[in-house]
Amino acid sequence: MASALTVKDPTVSERTVVVSGLPVGLSKDQLVKRYFRDEGGHVEKVIYPPRSKGVAYIIFKEKKVAQTIIRQKKHSLGSEPLLTVSHFSEKVFNYVMAILDLSVFRPQIVLESLVVDLKKKIPTLNFSPLGRSGKISVQGSFLAILKLKQALISKAISALENNRKYAGERRNWTGQNPRRVLQKNENSAPTLGTSVPEPAGSPETLVLDTDVFLYLKHKCQFYEPTLSKYHVLCQERVDGDITTLCLQDARDGSYPGSVRHVKELIEEWAQEFYLELRKELLVLEGRRESEKRNMRQAFEQLCCRYPRVLMNVHRTHIDLIGPPSDTSLFKTQLMKSAGQKVT
């Protein structure tokens, strides 16, 4: 992605598409001839990002050709899987790195076998060696990370169902234990198969991209009201690009299931934002103080005109996050207002 951004042409992002799901080891010429032969004469450049297997950035000579490709969304490859095609800046991130803690699967699954299975299911991901603690680093395209998430959720659900089945069998056995029945008060009617009430909703942990979380918190009117509605406390810990949320019942179990429900809602919103948001970065470092001052003044004037854009001002740069059209217009107006050349 960095290589594509270094092209000094203001239209390069509009002419660039991201292609995911490619067979690993495919050369640039093979990619164009096999999957984009009808548009081959319109291809200006093909970039394989070094950190993302199965992903390529294709820069077309004309914007309309790129738009035609994007409208198709998927390309049929005959007997092979479908390619996923998207706009270069359609997502907040095209490349993702995640650190997974697989130790939660340890009692039910051999972690080494789990990693081997995941590598087979999603070959476009890069896995680091599995640590003794059960942690492992994973790198790849955002779409591949989504597939990984679904695979892990399926594994977790399967393990949870097995645990519940075992717990249910154990409760039934305990409820029918003659020794327990005899220990009951003579005046009380013995009941067989009595199950222990499930504990109040335990805390839930959720890890999000910091930019997406900040947009969710500051630009979405339903985040705080949802926490209040379901009486859920949220502790936020920001650590660079990653934000960890700890959700907890605020009323000691008065609303069973509320914590899990809120977690699922936040996950759903975050996934939608991953696919819809666009991020623009304006570099301040290296500019003269007068240029920085002009940009900050223009920045303040444009805030009210683009309420759907989240603006984070840092010492070295400015982050703009929001819908693609809004962030693009905001950046253009900001640069023009500050007397800067739009690139």
UniProtKB/Swiss-Prot annotation:
The keyword RNA-binding applies. Residues 170-200 are annotated as: Disordered. Keywords: RNA-binding. Gene3D superfamilies: 3.30.70.330. GO terms for molecular function: RNA binding. PANTHER family: INTERFERON-INDUCED PROTEIN 35/NMI N-MYC/STAT INTERACTING PROTEIN, RNA-BINDING PROTEIN 43. Residues 184-194 have a biased composition (Polar residues). This is RNA-binding protein 43. It comes from the Eukaryota. Residues 15-90 form the RRM domain. InterPro entries: Nucleotide-bd_a/b_plait_sf, RBD_domain_sf, RRM_dom.
